[in-house]
């Protein structure tokens, strides 16, 4: 019996070795998606120049027609008026229609006697009426308005508050408009410190600045009446400041406005066309700068 048992044990099949299944192939991690190219923040810096400011409208029209939308806008003096209207949501066509129907006598609320010939409240009301009651911080495009603190001579950038008051302050040419009191301070034309507010567009976050200089170049002709003489004096002062301010612009536009003075409100369409031509001439350069700063 023992022999049979032993023989049975010897003839039992050996168990097969256990072989582990190979692990599934490891999939390589997916490549991270390519980052979406980020275009630079474009700032539009609109300079002062009184009635020559209609040229800013032509610049805006050409930008719109080419699908280029500024991310923010800063304005001085006449540039602050166009900047406020544009920031409120007005298109280039709407701005041109406003320019065509504008009655400059609405701005001339005379003040006798006073520290200026014009109070400026008419200008402030015009801005309020055409910006839909929006405050500066509520604008559809971020807006900055530059004025000069009369007490210390420093620049102030308005980014909050009543756009009418800010534009009035920014446009208050000394001796023409009364200084504008806001709180305990008095403010006058921003062109005294920043004729074209390039550095303020940078301060607001612009990575690429389009600067529009509409200042008049003295042509050697008689200035005529006192208003033209004052505006030309103001322009001469601003040109030396602009030499430094405009160095930081990525694209500089100087609309050609021969024989158009800052007091000439009859050349609106010609000024708009000059702005269009200035922007069209720099479109290729602007696209190159945008491409170079896209990352």
Please provide the spans of the model-predicted regions.
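Gly/Ala-rich beta-loop-alpha elbow adjacent to hydrolase catalytic centers
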Residues: 75, 79
């Amino acid at each position: 019996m023992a022999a049979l048992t032993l023989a049975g044990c010897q003839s039992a099949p050996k168990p097969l070795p256990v072989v582990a299944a190979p692990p599934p192939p490891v999939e390589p991690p997916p490549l991270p998606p390519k980052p979406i190219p980020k275009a630079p923040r474009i700032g539009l810096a609109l300079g002062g120049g009184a009635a020559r400011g209609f040229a800013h409208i032509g610049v805006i029209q050409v930008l719109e027609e080419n699908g280029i939308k500024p991310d923010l806008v800063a304005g001085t003096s006449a540039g602050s008026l166009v900047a406020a209207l544009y920031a409120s949501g007005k298109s280039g066509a709407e701005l041109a229609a406003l320019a065509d129907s504008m009655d400059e006598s609405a701005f001339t609320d005379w003040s006798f006697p006073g520290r200026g010939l014009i109070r400026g409240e008419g200008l402030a009301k015009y801005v309020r009426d055409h910006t839909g009651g929006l405050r500066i911080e509520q604008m559809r495009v971020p807006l900055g308005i530059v004025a000069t603190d009369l007490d210390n001579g420093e620049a102030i950038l308005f980014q909050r508050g009543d756009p009418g008051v800010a534009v009035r302050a920014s446009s208050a040419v000394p001796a023409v408009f009364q200084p504008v009191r806001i709180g305990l301070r008095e403010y006058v034309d921003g062109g005294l410190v920043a004729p074209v507010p390039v550095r303020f567009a940078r301060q607001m976050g612009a990575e690429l600045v389009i600067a529009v200089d509409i200042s008049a170049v003295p042509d050697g002709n008689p200035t005529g009446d006192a208003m033209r003489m004052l505006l030309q004096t103001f322009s001469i002062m601003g040109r030396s400041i602009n030499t430094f301010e405009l160095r930081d612009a990525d694209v500089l536009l100087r609309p050609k406005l021969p024989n158009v003075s800052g007091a000439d409100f009859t050349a609106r369409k010609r000024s708009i066309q000059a702005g269009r031509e200035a922007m069209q001439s720099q479109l290729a350069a602007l696209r190159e700068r945008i491409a170079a700063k896209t990352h």
